[in-house]
Amino acid sequence: MASTGASKSSKPPRSPRHSIIMQGFDKLPIISKDHVSSTAKGSLTPQIGGEDVNFYNDAYFQLVRKRFCIPTDVVESKEICNWDKMKPSEGKGGDAMLFTPDRKYIIKELGSDHPTLLNITKEYVEHVCGDSLLVRFAFHFYRCSNKKNYVVMNSWLPGPDEEHLDKKGFQEDQYQSVFDLKGCADDKMMVRGGKTLEQVHKRCWHCKLKCSKGNQARKNYKNAKVYARKCDFMLHFDERKRLMSKIQSDAQFLRKQGLMDYSLIVGVKQCPINVFKEKYLKKNKDGKIMNGGFSGGDIHGRDQKQPYYSVHDGQVYAYYIGIIDFLQFYNTGKKVAHYIKCCDIKPLATVRPTVYGTRFEDYFSQKFKVTKENTPEWLKVGGISDLNNDG
């Protein structure tokens, strides 16, 4: 398949909004590795989950909040951020995390990733305020009550819009599949067929799994991993072009920072095209499609807006996409892991950042393919593609 994305040396143009927000960026304070009290002079940052916390380099993260219209008090109340409900994630790191009720934001504990974010704060903020798929850190803070570090970030898989909360009436507006993809043997699925998959990892200390075929949950998990590795995603030419320009730009940035082991998270919704038109596209009195679609993902500008839509084989597909878990330097621990896993299934996740980033670009350039079907009018002009504009 011929590549339709931007060349690896090109970068997507900066939006006017990015230029305005980043004025005076070089005059911001020097990056500090110390947390600063929320009552510091000039600070307008609120509590998190009803607790006073101390913030890291908030002059920078204010720019992220401004760029992406994230309210300063987005997780201020206990109702939105209930610390008692925070629990370990199912990922290998197992860092504790909590979704807000609308699933638009995540509060996540930072363990070994904390010093990495401190080291790249300035570069990260400048990059993410452009056109990027990197997860947006709105706050980086220290929780005094348990002496741990956290971030507040956006979720690339938000819950349904308020008008689609009725799951029976709008069952199509649910994620049918969720993928966590690295371009290596670690590719996996978290949701398949609309059902959450139990993450049954095969570890050397799980003797029953090592010495037997394992239970049904393990088989389902393994089969889903194989599918995640082999499946393709179909997009129309323009949709694929704007997606790949971001993936390439982000991979270049992460390589430059010496980061690796990150993932592309992909949430997929789908339904027959006739159902989509009838239930999700809104028309005026003349029958012209005005707006509508599945619940929104990223809404900041035409080049940023999500989901990415395509029509293929009579189905409408909506893709919600972002890059997560990128705060990993290729340190001594990763180098040791590389040699320990040298006999493991290839390709490996623990490789040098230059290798990882190049492979990441190439893998998704092949995985996101151009559908042969024509782009529908509701996606090209006058339809849902024009709903969201910078401003």
Regions found by a protein language model. Name each.
Residues 1-391:
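Polybasic, positively charged surfaces/segments
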